[in-house]
């Protein structure tokens, strides 16, 4: 199946670390679409993203990233998913089919990222011994962990969950009718 996709889509390849939440987001997207694309695992735990050829390919030194046939690199999971949906896998749509629904989905994606995913990531990076001197994803390693960010992250996530619960009291889904 992957070989067949390689023939159809050329040399596009997803570089990923399956255990990372962002990478899982792309994998869930592809699973929902019932699609596969060629993939190469990058071992983030061993710092492989900081070594060549990956370091030159993606200046953010983060996963996942998608390399297109023309060598263009797209990083950030939502950007990858949006590109794949618009260019290769339009159905079933996950980003909406009308301007109103697209805007509504974007709104909720932003809220989930800003009020949930980012605070959670910051809390983990400021708590776990694995991230000492590595609180920012990528190449910076001079920023120290701050316990206050852990507490703030927990409070922000709790508030987001309350807002989602209130929304779901009146709606069957976060966005749309299916």
What are these regions (language model features)?
Residues 168-173:
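Extracellular-facing binding/remodeling surfaces
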Residues 149-167:
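Amphipathic alpha-helical packing segments from all-alpha helical-bundle domains
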Residues 6-147:
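GST-like domain detector, emphasizing the conserved glutathione-binding G-site
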Residues 174-178:
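GST superfamily/GST-like fold recognition
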